[in-house]
């Protein structure tokens, strides 16, 4: 990737990699559907195709009945599922989740982890970055990094 120009790197980021953050980064004045459609708009997808794909992925994360709701009308767990749907809508090869349960209570965090397990069982590659041992222990593989060095690499 070091030889790619900015446009090529942006294309990879937008089409091959999905990102989920601890803070949901949803647009406050947009509906769940519009938030999920955003990456497709940047990718030049038609409005009809963007709606179809966004509705499908919202259904996949269990939020088809909340698609017209603004983030302020959703619980923290629902907002995180909208963020996950947005990360998945471009069908990325890999999903990076940076502290995806950090702002959630333990039950909602477990719900998000169950969703990740389901997605992984369907073939989605997911890398979760977490400081929470109880979250890490739910993964198939745990790589511990300290001071920039790999300290352990274990499969569950």
Question: How would you describe each model-predicted region?
Answer:
Residues 1-145:
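ABC family nucleotide-binding domain
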Residues 142-154:
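H-loop (His-switch) and adjacent beta-strand-loop-beta switch element
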């Amino acid at each position: 990737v070091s030889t790619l120009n900015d446009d090529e790197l942006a294309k990879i980021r937008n089409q091959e990699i999905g990102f989920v953050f601890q803070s949901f980064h949803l647009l406050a004045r947009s509906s769940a559907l519009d938030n999920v459609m955003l990456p497709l708009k940047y990718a030049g997808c038609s409005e009809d195709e963007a709606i179809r794909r966004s509705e499908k992925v919202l259904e996949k994360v269990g939020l088809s009945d909340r698609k017209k709701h603004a983030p302020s009308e959703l619980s923290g767990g629902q907002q995180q599922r909208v963020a996950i749907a947005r990360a998945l809508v471009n069908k990325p090869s890999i999903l990076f989740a940076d502290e995806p349960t950090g702002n959630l209570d333990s039950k909602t965090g477990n719900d998000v982890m169950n969703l990740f397990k389901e997605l992984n069982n369907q073939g989605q590659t997911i890398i979760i970055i977490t400081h929470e041992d109880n979250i890490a222990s739910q993964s198939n593989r745990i790589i511990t990094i300290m001071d920039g060095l790999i300290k352990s690499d274990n499969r569950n």
